[in-house]
């Protein structure tokens, strides 16, 4: 009689999941080494931690990374825009370090493939969720700060966010991406897009996901705490995809 295989949990499950992926590419994209223990912690989402014996997760590192990111971006904007009032550079910073801005950076370094997620998140495409990508990016910055100090962490921020920082402007922070997309399509004599929006979660904490279609083709996908913001992000993604095709 064969015995049922015992499910690996706890630190053994953590080590097994972490070692299943080669992290060399990620570290190369970051341009810095991170100790194994810190890197494991930075990549451990609470869903994985909770499903494997309440292991430590990356939320404390995320807290640190958020502070490092905010200071590094704020100081750089202060230097780049000496004549801009506080209200403008504050809006610029908010746009750059937003969930969407962080998720963009995470996708550029293919961070999603390295995040340790629980089964529930894996089944709901957690590796592509803006919220998870953004939080893990901050956790990595927190890990870099803990190991190397502020100056190294700042340099990583300025390298990763170089384009966003140098092209920031107060104008366009609250851009209506749905209108921008509509105008771009009109110029190309393309048909209008359609939006499909769904929501999950309890009434007090709903997460909306919007998908924008051009005919039968998905052009963009966005998340947000309400339908409007989710559709705006989906429209932004669609607009960027159109621009890439034209480039």
Swiss-Prot record:
Residues 176-244 form the DRBM domain. Its EC number is 3.1.26.3. InterPro entries: dsRBD_dom, RNase_III, RNase_III_dom, RNase_III_sf. Its main location: cytoplasm. It is found in: Cytoplasm. The active site is at residues 66, 138. One of its GO terms (cellular component) is cytoplasm. Mg(2+) binds at residues 62, 135, 138. Keywords: Cytoplasm, Endonuclease, Hydrolase, Magnesium, Metal-binding, mRNA processing, Nuclease, RNA-binding, rRNA processing, rRNA-binding, tRNA processing. Residues 23-149 form the RNase III domain. Its cofactor is Mg(2+). It catalyses: Endonucleolytic cleavage to 5'-phosphomonoester. It is an enzyme of class 3 (hydrolase). SUPFAM superfamilies: dsRNA-binding domain-like, RNase III domain-like. GO terms for biological process: mRNA processing; regulation of gene expression; rRNA processing; tRNA processing. GO terms for molecular function: double-stranded RNA binding; metal ion binding; ribonuclease III activity; rRNA binding. The keyword Amino-acid biosynthesis does not apply. NCBIfam families: RNaseIII. Homodimer. Digests double-stranded RNA. Involved in the processing of primary rRNA transcript to yield the immediate precursors to the large and small rRNAs (23S and 16S). Processes some mRNAs, and tRNAs when they are encoded in the rRNA operon. Processes pre-crRNA and tracrRNA of type II CRISPR loci if present in the organism. PANTHER family: RIBONUCLEASE 3, RIBONUCLEASE III. Belongs to the ribonuclease III family. This is Ribonuclease 3. It comes from Corynebacterium efficiens (strain DSM 44549 / YS-314 / AJ 12310 / JCM 11189 / NBRC 100395).
């Amino acid at each position: 009689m064969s015995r049922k295989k015992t499910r690996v949990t706890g630190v053994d499950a953590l080590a097994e999941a972490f070692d299943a992926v080669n992290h060399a590419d990620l570290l190369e994209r970051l341009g810095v080494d991170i100790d194994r223990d810190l890197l494991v912690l930075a990549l451990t989402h609470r869903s994985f931690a909770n499903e494997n014996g309440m292991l430590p997760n990356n939320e404390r590192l995320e807290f640190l990374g958020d502070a490092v990111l905010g200071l590094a971006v704020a100081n750089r904007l202060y230097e780049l825009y000496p004549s801009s009032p506080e209200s403008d550079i504050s809006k610029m910073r908010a746009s750059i370090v937003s969930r969407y801005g962080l998720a963009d950076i995470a996708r550029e370094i293919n961070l999603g493939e390295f995040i340790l997620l629980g089964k529930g998140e894996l089944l709901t495409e957690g590796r592509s969720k803006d919220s998870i990508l953004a939080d893990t990016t901050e956790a990595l910055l927190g890990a870099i700060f803990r190991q190397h100090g502020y100056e190294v962490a700042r340099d990583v921020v300025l390298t990763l966010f170089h384009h966003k920082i140098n092209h920031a402007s107060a104008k366009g922070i609250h851009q209506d991406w749905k209108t921008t997309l509509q105008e771009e399509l009109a110029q190309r004599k393309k048909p209008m897009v359609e939006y499909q929006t769904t929501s999950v979660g309890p009434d007090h904490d709903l997460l909306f996901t919007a998908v924008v279609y051009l005919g039968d083709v998905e052009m963009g996908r966005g998340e947000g705490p309400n339908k409007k913001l989710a559709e705006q992000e989906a429209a932004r993604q669609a607009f960027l995809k159109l621009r890439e095709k034209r480039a």
